[in-house]
């Protein structure tokens, strides 16, 4: 009976309790607000701050009621001090030098000010500051301030706004846009009562060159847990000075110079000292962590995108460089984190540093690409911080956002998250994406997918959740996710998928109770979530109120750890902006929901409420849940992190409430506690690979020879091997008994070799399973990115010069071609076999996919617009079921959105050119010139349009029949058929006027069957006309035009070419006027066909082709022996080089545009050029004047660091060794870079030859090419410092100016030039602005060499310039259009100055006519030429009147009254004349004297004329033996130089200038002998050593009839 009554009573009590729990609702209090605000709760209290507009409010009851803080009404933003979250807060005032501070949870506030004299530079200044507290001494404050100077006309408010924006923007980018702003750091030791500026000065250069400076400081003690033994007063700082020019976002290379220093103070900033180990390094960033100090240095002072090094100090005193698996260039400074054992996680930015800024006027270029977004890689270090590795599964080349998240109470647990957009187009992001998420519970050693364990909802998923490898949860993003202060209870938004596709619409809310290992569905929509009572109370608010099919807003709450949910309807419709727990430690029961009021307009659309009450604050209180019952031990369960496995040598146990317990923990303000159970025995998880080892694909630690080399371990090796432990214990792991790690024997044969002391050269090796078809670098300074395509039609990308190589994801589509944009060097296009077009605008960092028109790919090269990045032309075959189909024809398609869409532009178009974008002065900037193929007869015609061929009215036929056309420099050259199997060339500079290329008269009998355009770098066209086309006997005439391409002169008559039209012709890059050619000596034998072996000889010119000579040979060979032909003269003993026609890769030029004066070539010394395998390798460092032999045998070469590093590999043979030189070729060192010999194929580096990394490509010899091995050889550590580049202080830098002209004081292009060259060999050049390294020492006086025939004029036989028949002179008024400041022009004389000439004064042939006023500039013309009345009177009228009066007086008194002029011839000196006074006598004496002088001069001239005439006649008769009339011819060498400065010696008819020289007073006649002044070479070279030289490749574009 008693038992039954007890049971009944108990059941009633339980029933009532359950009923009460079911009826529970939280206490919700709503307050309204008129503006935007943010909420900041103090820890362990009910006090909350609200920053609303400019006011600060406070609540003492978890947000139920609010009151304004009196006296504070100018707040810009506020924050709780993270080091003292229970008491301290700051509020930044709109008045920049004022900050409000509280140390008692807002009860009282003090005003902190920085005295203006501390930060003002004498001008008006405003500043905005952020205060940082000392971790252990709250009275110590650092103020990081951004100071902006302004003048009286500027408003303080705008200045403050700029300073404030700098706090939230990257400061460097901000200050680049506004150099009037700077940052400063101040310190206070008395809680902000006064501040002192930290003064750290760097005086490396003149302050006038200082662009701006930055200062960043941090307390040495990072937190109360810091292991730093420095004193509390220690502060680290880095000061950076930027000199030079302001950053320009349109250019990737910044013309700035960085000077920085890393210092510390141990007395609150009174004195500073440099950290000696980092002295001389460019410190870019630093951060003090609890267990280590991290410093990042920049390698190149002239390139803010240069490689960086990471330095780690565990004792905060000595530093060790950390090994990075890739070049470190872009990082997210400030987001580097440290875990409990000292591992560092480092996100690396892959941003687009080349993006256009808003000032770019080209709308096409301003379209935003996805590549402007951040794409990151994640690196993680070992526990010692000295070796970083990639998280391999996160590597991808799609548009990817990567993130690693860890949480304080989940020891050893990491979440990895990526969002990829593989099909993202240029028009904006797509909602289609690939999500991938993984979890690791062992510090990242192993990773697994996020399992879905949710059998009751299994049917709601699109994949089989029982197979987590292909169906798992992928988190949308963990940015903004709360720091789960719970024992393993978590909620996220994500989508369940196979990892290949996801959509925002599929995103739902999921919950986990085991630390993120397994998950189940919570809501079928996205929510914002918050936790209370350490996870026992959960609140979730839908982002979209209609997501639950209910238009009214609501929140959901769970009191059983997410097992069940209860809905709470809100009275107002809101957009949730903020949901937080009022207790930051997660222990409380009250939440704040901040939402914007919204009005429904039907459906799922919402708009802002127009009323002022737009903001609501909801206080949600769960204090009464479960009738305030607190949990007891029986309500708890034990839960272990990572399933109870040892993490860092310990197990971590939480005593958490069971999900079904009807109670709350109610330990308000108690931090979440766990029990640490030390593991007895250590396991593999307590060890990591030793420094010299890395994990292979199976997880085994294997030796890495690069790391082995860096460690120096092999210094102790015996017999070439060393015994090492492959694993080491993780720092700070807590396990007690160590594992036994067996030593392994590691070979050291390739480490610490004599040729690689101190491990200064590092090598990385990668293998491909097939041969490489093509490989090419992007030509940028941002990084060393290149694309490689294999024989299997797969594309790979590397961003660090081949050290790390990743496959480009094309969804298994084969790639048939890679095309680079020649005008935008970071752009490339991959053409897929199935019509896919993969586009990168950021050097292969990311690719987007587009679709080509549904046509057959013809393989015709794309045509790009020179100024519009997204505009190009693609050629596709239409109606091409078969390439042999009669209907198959080409169509030119155009895109203006970067390949996103294409439109048909021109039917039968096979070759187009955006000519209007390439001409210097186009007649229409929108002009396109296209070649059309008539499939019916195979003929081609040339047409142009100015509106993409949209209308016939703007389409013009230029030539009815052409063979082809090409562009070179500023010219466009068209080849037309002429007669039988001949052609003619026409050139244009503007796309409208075409002029026929007039060849020298002696070529009139030669058929023009084939010519090759060789380039126009010097303003004239170099052209090769084939004069012999016998098989294996091809050669021809080398010609050069004037600057408008209308007339040519001959340079050399038998220059070698091959059957493909390539010519042995190479201009030396970077130097003016130096060209190398090979000529055929046995032309008669070759033309007759009696031999197929051409005897080639090499020649060089130093004046752009005017004079040629054989190349001087070295005195001795590389073995110190004399050549057998020595002493026989240059004709029998000169240097001969293998040229352009024999190259496997036309990019392998003799020279480099950045290594001035250096050339390397393969050749021989003798009478003729020998086969390559009988040759040696030579180099020169003075532009080709003198040469040295480097080694016997042929080698391939490459230049690095602008010639500071030279590398050679054997050409075409097996080897494992390279040669390198760092002293301009004076000494060479052998270095073994491979473990075994491989077939050498190529050596390459960046196009600018500025890097210190080289890529060597080797290949096996199987049928399909077998495997390919690429070696990335890094010389970056070979130099101890960067060269000092300071042209203003020549005595203190590492450069000097040198001349490469072998004839001193000789002028070319009107000047004498010098080039900058590095002096010392212990430094590297890097990105120093060597474009300024060319200087003109002297501008020469103008001579005939500096003029050429004007547009539509040609050089006649008499040497003068005459108008081409049928053409008219160019409109002289064009100068008025091209130069808005011009007010006058001259009529054309037929001559104009050569564009490259800088001559001054001297001969003037182009402006001898009288000036005429420009249209609309008559008044300005008159103003500059007229003389005013007074000046005219003084200068002309008055003197004229005086002279007239004197003349009349003399005539009247001395001539008229003595008989007049009729007696003039009769008067004798003694005759009587009228003399009445002294005046008459004086006048008569003047008349007598004038008469005597006139008579004497006239008589003398007659006698001399008669004598000279007779003498000359007699001499002529004696010499010629005949009599006849004689003619006087004006002759001078100066005038006989060619119309394009090359006539002398090339046109024997151009020697009569009589018709031209109608007024010889117009010219200076130079009578000096012009001789062969450009042939300075001696028969024997001197004994002194010489080094290398480099040059430019020619266009070598051929047109044949």
Swiss-Prot record:
Known function: Functions as a sorting receptor in the Golgi compartment required for the intracellular sorting and delivery of soluble vacuolar proteins, like carboxypeptidase Y (CPY) and proteinase A. Executes multiple rounds of sorting by cycling between the late Golgi and a prevacuolar endosome-like compartment.
Biased composition (Basic and acidic residues): 352-369, 1577-1587
Paired cysteines (S-S): none
Pfam families to which the protein is assigned, alphabetical: Sortilin-Vps10, Sortilin_C
Chain positions covered by the region annotation Disordered: 349-369, 1558-1601
Transmembrane segments: 1431-1451
Positions annotated as glycosylated: 121, 156, 457, 505, 1044, 1289, 1339
Biased composition (Polar residues): 1591-1601
Cytoplasmic face residues: 1452-1601
SUPFAM superfamilies xref list: Oligoxyloglucan reducing end-specific cellobiohydrolase (SSF110296)
Endpoints of the signal sequence: 1-20
Biological-process GO terms, alphabetical: Golgi to endosome transport; Golgi to vacuole transport; protein targeting to vacuole
PANTHER family: SORTILIN RELATED (PTHR12106), SORTILIN-RELATED RECEPTOR (PTHR12106:SF27)
Ranges occupied by BNR repeats: 58-67, 100-110, 439-448, 510-520, 556-566, 796-806, 838-849, 893-903, 1178-1188, 1220-1228
Compartments where found: Golgi apparatus, trans-Golgi network membrane; Prevacuolar compartment membrane
Membrane topology annotation: Single-pass type I membrane protein
Residues on Lumenal side: 21-1430
Highest taxon in the source lineage: Eukaryota
GO cellular component: cytosol; Golgi apparatus; membrane
Homology family: Belongs to the VPS10-related sortilin family.
Name used for this protein in its record: Vacuolar protein sorting/targeting protein 10
UniProt keyword annotation of Repeat present: yes
């Amino acid at each position: 009976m008693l038992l039954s009554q007890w049971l009944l009573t108990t059941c009633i009590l339980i029933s009532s309790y359950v009923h009460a729990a079911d009826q529970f609702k939280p206490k919700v209090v709503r307050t309204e607000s008129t503006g935007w605000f943010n909420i900041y709760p103090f820890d362990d209290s009910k006090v909350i701050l609200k920053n609303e507009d400019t006011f600060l409010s406070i609540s003492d009851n978890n947000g139920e009621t609010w009151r304004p803080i009196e006296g504070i009404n100018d707040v810009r933003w506020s924050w709780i001090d993270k080091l003292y979250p229970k008491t301290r807060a700051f509020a930044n005032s709109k008045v920049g030098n004022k900050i409000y501070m509280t140390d008692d949870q807002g009860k009282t506030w003090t005003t902190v000010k920085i005295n203006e004299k501390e930060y003002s530079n004498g001008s008006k200044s405003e500043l905005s500051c952020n205060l940082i507290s000392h971790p252990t001494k709250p009275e110590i404050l650092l103020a990081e301030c951004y100071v902006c100077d302004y003048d009286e006309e500027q408003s303080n408010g705008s200045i403050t706004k700029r300073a404030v924006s700098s706090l939230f923007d990257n400061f460097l980018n901000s200050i680049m846009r506004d150099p009037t702003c700077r940052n400063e750091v101040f310190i206070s030791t008395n809680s902000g009562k006064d501040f002192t500026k930290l003064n750290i000065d760097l005086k490396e250069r003149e302050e006038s060159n200082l662009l701006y400076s930055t200062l960043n400081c941090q307390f040495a003690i990072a937190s109360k847990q810091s292991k730093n033994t420095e004193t509390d007063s220690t502060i680290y700082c880095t000061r950076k000075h930027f000199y030079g020019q302001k950053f320009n976002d349109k250019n990737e290379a910044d013309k700035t110079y960085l000077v920085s220093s890393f210092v510390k103070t141990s007395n609150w900033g009174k004195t500073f000292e440099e950290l000696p180990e980092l002295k001389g390094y460019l410190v870019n960033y630093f951060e003090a962590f609890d267990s280590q100090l991290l410093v990042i240095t920049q390698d190149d002072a002239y390139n803010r995108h240069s490689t960086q090094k990471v330095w780690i100090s565990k004792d905060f005193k000595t530093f060790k460089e950390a090994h990075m698996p890739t070049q470190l260039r872009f990082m997210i400074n400030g987001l580097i984190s440290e875990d409990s054992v000292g591992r560092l996680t480092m996100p690396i930015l892959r941003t687009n540093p080349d993006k256009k800024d808003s000032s770019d006027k080209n709308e096409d270029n301003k379209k935003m690409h996805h590549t402007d977004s951040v794409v990151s890689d994640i690196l993680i270090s070992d526990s010692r911080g000295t070796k970083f590795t990639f998280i391999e599964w996160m590597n991808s080349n799609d548009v990817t956002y990567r993130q690693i998240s860890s949480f304080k109470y989940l020891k050893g647990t990491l979440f990895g998250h990526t969002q990829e957009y593989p099909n993202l187009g240029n028009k904006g992001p797509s909602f289609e994406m690939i999500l991938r998420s993984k979890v690791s519970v062992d510090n990242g050693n192993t990773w697994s997918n996020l399992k879905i364990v949710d059998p009751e909802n299994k049917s709601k998923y699109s994949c089989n959740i029982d197979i987590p490898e292909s169906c798992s949860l992928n988190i949308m993003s963990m940015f903004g996710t709360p720091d789960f202060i719970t024992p393993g209870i978590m909620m996220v938004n994500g989508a369940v998928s196979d990892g290949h596709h996801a959509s925002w619409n599929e995103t739902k809310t999921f919950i986990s109770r085991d630390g993120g290992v397994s998950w189940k569905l919570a809501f079928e929509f996205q929510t914002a979530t918050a936790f209370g009572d350490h996870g026992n109370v959960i609140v979730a608010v839908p982002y979209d109120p209609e997501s639950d099919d209910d238009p009214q807003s609501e929140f959901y709450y769970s009191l059983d750890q997410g097992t069940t949910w209860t809905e709470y309807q809100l009275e107002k419709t809101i957009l949730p902006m903020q949901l937080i727990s009022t207790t930051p430690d997660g222990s409380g029961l009250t939440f704040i929901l901040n939402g914007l009021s919204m009005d429904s307009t039907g459906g799922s659309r919402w708009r802002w409420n127009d009323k002022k009450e737009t903001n609501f604050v909801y206080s949600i209180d769960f204090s009464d849940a479960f009738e305030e019952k607190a949990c007891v031990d029986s309500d708890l369960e034990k839960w272990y992190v990572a399933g109870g496995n040892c993490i860092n040598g310990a197990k971590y146990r939480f005593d958490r409430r069971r999900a079904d317990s009807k109670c709350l923990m109610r330990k308000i303000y108690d931090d979440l506690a766990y029990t640490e159970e030390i593991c007895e025995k250590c396991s593999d998880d307590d060890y990591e690979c030793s420094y010299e080892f890395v994990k292979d694909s199976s997880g085994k630690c294997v030796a890495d020879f690069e790391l082995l080399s860096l460690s120096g371990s092999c210094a102790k090796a015996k017999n070439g091997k060393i015994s090492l432990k492959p694993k080491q214990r993780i720092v700070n792991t807590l396990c007690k008994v160590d594992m036994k790690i067996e030593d392994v024997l590691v070979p050291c044969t390739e480490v610490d070799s004599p040729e690689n002391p101190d491990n200064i050269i590092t090598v990385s090796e990668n293998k491909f399973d097939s041969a490489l078809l093509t490989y090419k670098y992007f030509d940028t300074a941002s990084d060393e990115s290149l694309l490689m395509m294999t024989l299997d039609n797969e594309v790979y990308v590397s961003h660090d010069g081949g050290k790390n190589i990743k496959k480009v994801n094309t969804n298994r589509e084969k790639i048939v071609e890679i095309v680079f944009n020649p005008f935008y060097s970071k752009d490339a296009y991959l053409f897929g076999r199935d019509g896919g077009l993969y586009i990168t605008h950021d050097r292969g960092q990311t690719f987007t996919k587009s679709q080509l028109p549904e046509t057959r790919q013809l393989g015709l090269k794309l045509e790009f617009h020179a100024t519009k990045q997204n505009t190009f032309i693609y050629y596709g075959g239409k109606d091409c079921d078969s390439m042999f189909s009669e209907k198959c024809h080409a169509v030119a398609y155009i895109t203006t959105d970067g390949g996103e869409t294409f439109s048909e532009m021109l039917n039968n178009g096979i070759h187009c050119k955006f000519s209007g974008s390439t001409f210097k002065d186009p007649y229409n900037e929108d002009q396109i010139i296209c070649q059309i193929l008539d499939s019916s007869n195979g003929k081609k015609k040339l047409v142009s349009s100015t509106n993409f061929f949209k209308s016939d009215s703007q389409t013009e036929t230029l030539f009815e029949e052409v063979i082809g056309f090409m562009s070179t420099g500023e010219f466009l050259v068209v080849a037309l058929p002429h007669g039988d199997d001949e052609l003619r060339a026409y050139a244009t500079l503007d796309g409208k006027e075409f002029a026929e290329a007039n060849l020298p008269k002696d070529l009139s009998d030669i058929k023009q069957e084939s010519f090759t355009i060789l380039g126009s770098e010097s303003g004239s066209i170099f052209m090769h006309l084939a004069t012999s086309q016998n098989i294996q006997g091809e050669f021809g005439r080398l010609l050069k035009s004037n600057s408008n391409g209308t007339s040519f002169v001959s340079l050399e008559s038998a220059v070698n070419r091959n059957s493909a039209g390539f010519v042995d012709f190479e201009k030396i890059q970077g130097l003016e006027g130096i060209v190398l050619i090979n000529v055929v000596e046995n032309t008669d034998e070759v033309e007759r066909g009696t031999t197929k072996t051409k005897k080639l000889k090499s020649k060089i010119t130093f004046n752009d082709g005017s004079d040629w000579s054989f190349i001087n040979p070295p005195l001795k060979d590389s073995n110190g022996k004399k050549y057998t032909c020595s002493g026989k003269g240059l004709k029998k003993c000169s240097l001969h080089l293998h040229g352009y026609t024999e190259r496997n890769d036309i990019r392998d030029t003799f020279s480099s545009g950045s290594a001035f004066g250096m050339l390397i070539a393969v050749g021989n010394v003798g009478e003729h050029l020998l086969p390559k395998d009988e040759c040696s390798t030579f180099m020169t460092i003075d532009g080709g004047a003198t040469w040295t032999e480097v080694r016997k045998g042929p080698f391939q070469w490459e230049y690095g660091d602008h010639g500071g590093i030279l590398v050679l590999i054997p050409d075409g043979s097996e080897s494992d060794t390279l040669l390198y030189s760092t002293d301009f070729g004076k000494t060479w060192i052998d270095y073994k870079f491979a473990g075994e010999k491989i077939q050498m194929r190529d050596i390459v580096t960046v196009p600018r030859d500025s890097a210190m990394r080289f890529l060597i490509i080797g290949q096996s010899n199987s049928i399909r090419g077998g495997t390919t091995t690429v070696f990335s050889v890094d010389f970056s550590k070979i130099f101890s410092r960067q060269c000092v580049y300071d042209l203003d202080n020549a005595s203190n830098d590492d450069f000097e100016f040198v001349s490469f002209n072998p004839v001193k004081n000789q002028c070319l292009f009107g000047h004498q030039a010098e080039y900058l060259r590095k002096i010392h060999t212990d430094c590297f050049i890097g990105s120093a602005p060597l474009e300024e390294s060319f200087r003109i020492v002297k501008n020469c006086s103008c001579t005939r060499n500096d003029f050429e025939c004007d547009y539509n004029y040609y050089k006649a036989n008499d040497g003068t310039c005459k108008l081409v028949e049928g053409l008219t002179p160019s409109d002289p008024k064009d100068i008025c259009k091209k130069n808005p400041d011009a007010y006058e022009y001259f009529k054309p004389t037929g001559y104009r100055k050569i564009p490259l000439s800088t001559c001054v004064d001297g001969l003037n042939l182009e402006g001898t006519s009288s000036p005429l006023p420009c249209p609309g500039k008559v008044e300005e013309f008159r103003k500059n030429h007229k003389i005013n009345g007074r000046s005219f009177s003084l200068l002309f009228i008055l003197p004229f009147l005086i002279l007239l009066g004197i003349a009349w007086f003399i005539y009247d008194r001395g001539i008229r009254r003595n008989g007049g002029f009729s007696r003039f011839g009769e008067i004798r000196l003694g005759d009587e004349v009228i003399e009445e006074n002294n005046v008459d006598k004086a006048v008569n004496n003047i008349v007598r004297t004038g008469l005597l002088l006139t008579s004497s001069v006239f008589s003398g001239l007659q006698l001399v004329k008669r004598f000279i005439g007779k003498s000359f006649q007699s001499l002529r008769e004696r010499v010629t033996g005949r009599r006849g009339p004689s003619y006087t011819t004006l002759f001078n060498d100066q005038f006989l130089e060619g119309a394009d400065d090359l006539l002398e010696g090339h046109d024997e008819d151009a020697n009569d200038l009589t018709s031209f020289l109608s007024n010889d007073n117009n010219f200076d006649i130079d009578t000096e002998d012009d001789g062969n002044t450009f042939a300075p070479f001696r028969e024997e070279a001197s004994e002194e050593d010489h080094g290398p030289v480099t040059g430019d490749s020619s266009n070598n574009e051929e047109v044949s009839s």
